[in-house]
Amino acid sequence: MKKYLIILAVLAVVVMISGCTTTSNINTKNFSTSGMSFQYPDTWNVSSQVNNNSTQVMVASPEFISSNATKGSVLLIIKLSKSGDNNMSQTRQELITQAQQSGQNATNATINIAGVTASDISYTGKDTTGNNTYGRLIDFEKNNSLYLLLFASGGGADIDAVKPYFDVIIKSFNVE
């Protein structure tokens, strides 16, 4: 019995050291406009523009801002009034085709966001200078509006490190 307790104690220490029991704690701020709201990392910058038929929100990492958009991570959120001209299925297919033709790894899935099932396309690859790049498009319709969330990271930014920051926004994104 003592042998099992020692083994369990060692396993518990290994799990605690490896971080398997801790979660990432990212400090956030709240943002709300045009019936959408979300949390975002408190070190990031948010700007928005509201027009008659659309709302654009940009959420940018400090690295993106300080490099004049040559390195870092950014999210562009676009809300459009639904019309017959909006054809996201064609846009999705074009994005996947372009990613695959340029040798990038593209995935096409769905995700639950803002209480609906949304299209979720992501890709990883290299830019023209050999830096890792990451892009993601989440789009959905709700309340007669079309929502597009366009994530991008590149220029040598640490893509794996930024994904939890993007996840904070995705998990908290809400539409009235």
Regions found by a protein language model. Give the residues of each.
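N-terminal targeting sequences that direct proteins away from the cytosol to non-cytosolic compartments
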Residues: L5-S66, A109-T110, D127-T129, N143, ...
